[in-house]
Curated annotation (Swiss-Prot):
Record's protein name: G2/mitotic-specific cyclin-B
Pfam families: Cyclin_C (PF02984), Cyclin_N (PF00134)
Organism: Drosophila melanogaster
GO MF term list: cyclin-dependent protein serine/threonine kinase regulator activity
Region of interest (Disordered), ranges: 76-152
Keywords: Cell cycle, Cell division, Cyclin, Mitosis, Phosphoprotein
Residue ranges of the TM segments: none
Biological role stated in the UniProt entry: Essential for the control of the cell cycle at the G2/M (mitosis) transition.
The keyword Phosphoprotein is annotated on this UniProt entry: yes
Subunit-level organization: Interacts with the protein kinase Cdk1 to form a serine/threonine kinase holoenzyme complex also known as maturation promoting factor (MPF). The cyclin subunit imparts substrate specificity to the complex.
Classification via SUPFAM superfamilies: Cyclin-like
Amino acid sequence: MVGTTLKMRGDENASENFKQVQLKKLTVPSMEATTKRAALGDLQNRGISRPIAAKDAAQKDSKDLKLTDALRNAKARVDSHWKKQPLGSTNGNGNGAVPPKVNEGGVSAFLRSNSVRNRVPTKTTVEPTKVTVKSSSSENVNEPTLKREDSNLSKKSLTKLRAALAKPVMGVSGIRREPVAVSRKEAETKKELPETKKDSLEVKKDATRMPLIRGNSAVTTTTSTMPTTMSLSSKRLAGIEDIDANDKENLVLVSEYVNDIYDYLYQVELEQPIHKDHLAGQKEVSHKMRAVLIDWINEVHLQFHLAAETFQLAVAIIDRYLQVVKDTKRTYLQLVGVTALFIATKYEELFPPAIGDFVFITDDTYTARQIRQMELQIFKAIDCNLSRPLPIHFLRRYSKAAGAEDEHHTMSKYFIELASVDYEMATYRPSEIAAASLFLSLHLLNGNHRAGTGFNDRHWTPTLTFYSRYSAAHLRPITRLIAKLARDAPQAKLKAIYNKYQGSKFQKIALRTELTGALMDSIVGQSQRK
């Protein structure tokens, strides 16, 4: 590469006799051009050891030898034009790094030529940047909103709730149900044996792999993997189907440890029970007020188009709070219910309603501040624990084990919501409610609903017994109570759930003739008729 000579343009007052010595100073030697040229930013970073802030850089003493030596062989990069690369593009070195934000300062701004003074960065200092996502009201997110003209919540429902709260308190008495003790065996640690005893060790391992026997209490887990356990269980227990055999390719279904998950859920529901007659110590709140409150919450739940888990979690929060706080005032019972639903929406929903919507559904009876204060009190009462399993969690597992259709599953959900309003059903575990609801659905939809044959244990197969851990004999009393609630739903005073399941969204389950046939009457029993 031949040395490049910079051409200079003189003005009108410039001297024609330009000195040759000055032209040599503006000429770059050809030998110097062939050498590797350092980047200006890197060169000046090495030359400048400290920033100059107090003193003007143009007035800096020219006897700075380090700066002079560093800039002696520098050549202005006037033959290249730097262009800012878009985000995500690669730089000239091909490393794909994004050019960092640079700050110019110090002596370097005055030591460059005018052609590149405003282009080439000198002393590079990388500043960290934060990426923040701001939510705006113009986003295309269909969040559920509640308008006064579109609301189906009439003042009649609020009047009904207030009338129930204004009635004299009925005494609630009963015996508390003690939680069933949970016993688990600790996993035994395996000791390493010498290589000469490997064969005998493998034989002992095969001999100790026992099937997972499931009863009404918590079970003992094994150290073997689930496919091996299920294959051995299928050999020992005839008629039990491995419902997770075809789910190995679907990682969402976690078939490898799905039974371990349900072992944990069964344990948690025993650790967080709702005792029998849990409102016995309440002075101003009765079981009728609770029923009116939950019926109203179900109506709000339908209005907001919330998930099934949200309603069931709200009911669980209400019962757990009333079980602990025995001095709940009658005037604050609706506040407890709406706050429990507010917590459940934030826990279960992807787009929970705003707190202003919950203020509106109470007809401005409570403020947003009161809801937040009650939220803190509820979390303190339940020890910030929202992990109690719900009936819908077990129902999905049982429906899969039964090979149920959509109508079986929907009818079982209808029975579960009816049971949530009843005070006597609150003491049963969520797994028992789900199993009894499916047991009743199998009777009505798979059997002859016109024949009063009563219970048929053949609907509860060995596979259902294995995965639910309940026998048909254990579920009969619970199923009979649920059947009575379903049969009397059209004549009940609280009809929010009955009206809800008359819609086409729920396959009009509440209008099915199976719910009023002879089979239903035989399951309920003649002695329990009104």
